[in-house]
Swiss-Prot record:
It comes from Mesorhizobium japonicum (strain LMG 29417 / CECT 9101 / MAFF 303099). Pfam families: CsbD. InterPro entries: CsbD (IPR008462), UPF0337_stress_rsp (IPR050423), YjbJ_sf (IPR036629). PANTHER family: UPF0337 PROTEIN YJBJ. This is UPF0337 protein mll8179. Belongs to the UPF0337 (CsbD) family. Residues 1-42 are annotated as: Disordered.
Amino acid sequence: MRNMVNKDQVAGLAKQLKGSVKQAAGKATGNRRTQAEGMADKVAGKVQKAYGDVKDKVKKAF
C-alpha cells in the first residue's frame, strides 16, 4: 500500500513553516505581535496536520 499524504497534512506543515519564519522574523525585529502571530500559525498548522493524520488513519482502516 502506498503512503499518500493528504492536503491537510501538507497544508498543516506549510502553516508550521510559515509560522516558524514569522516567529523568527518577529523575534529578530523585536516585534512581539509578529512573533505571537507566528506562534499562532505554528499551532494552527500542528492542529491541521494532526487532523490530516487522523483522516489518513481512518481512510487506511477502511
